């Protein structure tokens, strides 16, 4: 399971890094894309914090300047790799409160997979937003990454 999650987080790291690099090159990043990518970073931080049983550093829809994306992304990834490296049981159940204070329980593997799936979902929305703004989206499909 560790190898599987490390591969997925490598993919996530690659995709987010490419998207950050692309946005830095642009004269103007569409506002919706900035909101969505900030949300990806925030959610990743929030899920890591839930797993570790500590408070999150960011709010769900907090907007970050592009110049901060790389550092936030790196810290999120570092934390996730630490979680997967130290995990002894991926089926352990973890209790956490959502943003409204409701208690939920999920397995570690489901929480980790959600981070990846959630990020992929919103990167596809960013790709659509790029097209809507006459920008060329990146090819970030998993199969392209594995080639």
Regions found by a protein language model. Give the residues of each.
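General structural signal for secondary-structure boundaries
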Residues: 1, 26-27, 65-66, 86-89, ...
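Short secondary-structure transition/capping segments
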Residues: 2, 68-80, 130-143
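Active-site metal-coordination segments of metallo-dependent hydrolases
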Residues: 2-9
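A structural signal for well-ordered alpha-helical scaffolds and beta->alpha junctions
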Residues: 5, 16, 73-77, 123
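Short, contiguous alpha-helical
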Residues: 9-61, 102-147
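Helix-adjacent hinge/juxtasegments
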Residues: 56-94
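A short, surface-exposed loop/turn module that caps and links secondary-structure elements
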Residues: 96-98
